[in-house]
Amino acid sequence: MDYDYIIVGGGSAGCALANRLSEQKKNKVLLLEAGKSSHPLSRLPISFAMLVDNPSANWRYRSEPEEGTSNRQIPVPRGKLLGGSSSINGLLYICLLYTS
């Protein structure tokens, strides 16, 4: 099958882009995501802690050891399901102060 657009990564931006491109009926859009289409725990705000160390929902990346962290590796959660990291962040967001 032929596609006009192939989007790799079904995170927030990839999904938004695929949606926007597919609004034009002539466009054939393929959205690729390595993980599952969803995870039951991703819909419950309190359960994000269970997804952070779950290999089916998180790539489980770690930072490189650095002097400033006493040579520790710090977990860097990255979502591995449709919606990407937004699906494992516990539905949290940060609002800046108006004065910022």
Question: Which residues does each predicted region cover?
Answer:
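Conserved small/polar residues in nucleotide/adenosyl-binding loops
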Residues: 98-99
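FAD-binding core of FAD-dependent oxidoreductases
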Residues: 81-89
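Beta1/beta-strand and adjacent pyrophosphate-binding region of the FAD-binding site
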Residues: 1-11
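Aromatic pocket-lining residues of Rossmann-like dinucleotide-binding sites
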Residues: 21
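Glycine-rich FAD cofactor-binding loop and adjacent beta-loop-alpha segment at the N-terminus
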Residues: 91-95
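N-terminal FAD cofactor-binding segment of flavoenzymes
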Residues: 34-77
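Short beta-strand "acidic-cap" motif of Rossmann-like dinucleotide-binding folds
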Residues: 28-33
